[in-house]
Amino acid sequence: QYLVSDFYLKLRSVMPKNGYCIMGITWTDLYPKEELNFVLGEASGAHKSGVFSFGRFEPKSYNPEMSSDIFEIDEKILWRLLKVMSHEVCHLFGLSHCEYFLCAMNESTSLHEAMSQPLFLCPVCLRKLQTVCKFDLIQRFQKLETFLSQLKRSWYIPEIERSIEWLQRCLHFCKEGDTDNSDGFAE
């Protein structure tokens, strides 16, 4: 088990000059400080770096004799990687833990809590990220849909299919508005 902050300076030293931040991935379990026994991931805005571990996900799968081990992941691990990495990268863009809605930025104290959170940001956190990154919302949803659709061609992950469907509903709403009228109100 490694102290997560020990990675920050090393990661920062290998970050490309034109990079905004850098993330490290390890199979070895991490802990954030002596008082806490584990963390799935952590990011430091000051160091513009973060790290997350598969140690809690698949502790028996780590083989120190095989350096290629990190590339031999299955669908379950890939889904977890997407969720934890996107959460930590959002920290690097200045987002803190969300207390408003069900959100990718909710704090978690267990693997179960982390995996029960959505992949996507709530409206409050999405707006915060949009303010920092200056992205077009529709283009962002389209790029996420394209990325997840490409993953879907190579991996069978039911959560990806549901995520694509959610993105398609968001895109439809952004482009067409709410045409359902199921609330009973006339336009």
Feature annotation, model-predicted:
Residues 46-80, 96-187:
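Metalloprotease/metallohydrolase-associated module, dominated by Zn2+-dependent proteases
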Residues 1-86, 92-96, 101:
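Metzincin-family zinc-dependent endopeptidase catalytic domain
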